[in-house]
């Protein structure tokens, strides 16, 4: 990871800071032990939505995303495979597409922007179940089958904007499976024995006020980040601060004796609009999308789903974000290794080579 955050990374971090605490808290209040979401995927969709918005909606999205246009980069989060990368199994993609109703009247400027940025636009009868299946199949294809949500567009839908993100990468130095053993994880509701991966690594480490954070490099020079609080409670704000500092290249290199549990997180957020409204996009449930669909206000639903898993080999993660607009509706004489065992609830993030927050999550029960 080069430690230089490009514009897309900066905008994704703005979205991460605005929404992570609310999204993960809502997911956990819904009974999910582990939760994850993709700030980069959401930022990508909102950047396209901004181009199709006007009035108050445009101002609110400008305030959330900040200045600049992440859409000018063909690979804004720098995840597309490079020939020099050594892991043959590496796969990643970031894509956005739009389905517009035959009744929508998008502006030439919006269609031209989509064409310039590689956002494929289809015009169809969105009420036809075939289109819903097509959208679901597109998400499944872009996430390599990891996510296949059931989509149901109504006959009054004027637009369906979809963003997808996928990453499959190996650790730069994979864990040896024979070192994995079962040990106690101190969950909030009591201890449980889970599989821990073990090794000694030289990691970048930052000590926060009440947390310790470290990074684990991936084969592509992306990185998976971990933050382990020293006490219970909500530490999302400090975790994000430490993740962002690590993504910018901060941290002292230390020899660390690691203990990391294998885990999987999956989260579906059927109404991201509430979190967007709380973050200042007050029109999230009824956006002004005149440049996209030709009418306003437009009842709007935003849906987000994400999945993340790690094992001895590496990480696999995927996400999608859907916006439906309706008519009316990770020395020579070495010191003793520092020991970090993630044996209690902790935070995770995956950042791209440019430091963009691809995924952010919390693990309370591996």
Identify what each model region corresponds to.
Residues 61-65, 175-184, 236-247:
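Short Gly/aromatic-enriched secondary-structure transition segments
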Residues 35, 212, 344-346:
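Short loop/turn microsegments at loop-to-beta-strand junctions
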Residues 306, 312-366:
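C-terminal soluble interaction/assembly domains
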Residues 55, 234-236:
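Extended intrinsically disordered, low-complexity coil regions enriched in Ser, Thr, Gly, Ala
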Residues 1-126, 363:
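Detector for small/aliphatic-rich hydrophobic stretches
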Residues 25-33, 209-210, 239-245, 331-332:
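Short amphipathic beta-strand starts and helix->beta connectors
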Residues 32, 76-231, 251-332:
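Non-catalytic, conformational "gating/processing" segments within enzyme and secreted inhibitor domains
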């Amino acid at each position: 990871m080069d430690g230089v955050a490009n514009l897309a990374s900066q905008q994704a971090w703005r979205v991460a800071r605005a929404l992570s605490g609310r999204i993960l808290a809502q997911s956990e209040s819904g009974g999910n032990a582990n939760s994850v979401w993709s700030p980069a995927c959401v930022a990508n969709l909102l950047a396209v939505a901004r181009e199709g918005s006007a009035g108050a909606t445009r101002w609110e999205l400008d305030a959330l995303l900040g200045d600049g246009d992440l859409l000018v980069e063909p690979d804004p989060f720098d995840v597309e495979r490079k020939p020099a990368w050594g892991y043959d199994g590496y796969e990643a993609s970031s894509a956005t597409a739009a389905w517009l109703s035959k009744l929508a009247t998008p502006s030439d400027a919006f269609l031209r922007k989509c064409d310039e940025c590689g956002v494929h636009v289809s015009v169809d009868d969105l009420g036809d179940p075939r289109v819903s299946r097509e959208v679901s199949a597109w998400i499944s294809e872009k996430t390599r089958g990891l996510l296949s949500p059931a989509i149901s567009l109504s006959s009054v839908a004027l637009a369906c904007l979809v963003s997808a993100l996928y990453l499959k990468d190996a650790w730069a130095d994979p864990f040896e499976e024979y070192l994995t053993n079962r040990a106690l994880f101190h969950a909030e509701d009591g201890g449980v024995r889970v599989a821990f991966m073990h090794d000694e690594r030289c990691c970048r480490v930052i000590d926060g006020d009440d947390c310790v954070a470290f990074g684990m490099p991936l084969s592509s020079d992306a990185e998976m980040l971990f933050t382990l609080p020293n006490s219970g409670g909500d530490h999302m704000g400090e975790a994000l601060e430490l993740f962002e500092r690590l993504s910018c290249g901060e941290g002292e290199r230390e020899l660390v004796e690691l203990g990391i549990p294998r885990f999987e997180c999956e989260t579906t957020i059927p109404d991201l609009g509430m979190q967007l409204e709380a973050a200042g996009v007050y029109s999230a449930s009824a956006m002004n999308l005149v440049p996209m669909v030709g009418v306003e206000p437009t009842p709007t639903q935003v849906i987000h789903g994400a999945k993340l898993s790690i094992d001895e080999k590496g990480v696999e993660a995927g996400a999608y974000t859907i916006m439906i607009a309706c008519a009316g509706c990770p020395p020579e004489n070495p010191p003793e290794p520092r020991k970090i065992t993630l044996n209690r609830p902790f935070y995770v993030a995956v950042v791209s080579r440019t430091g963009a927050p691809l995924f952010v999550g919390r693990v309370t029960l591996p």
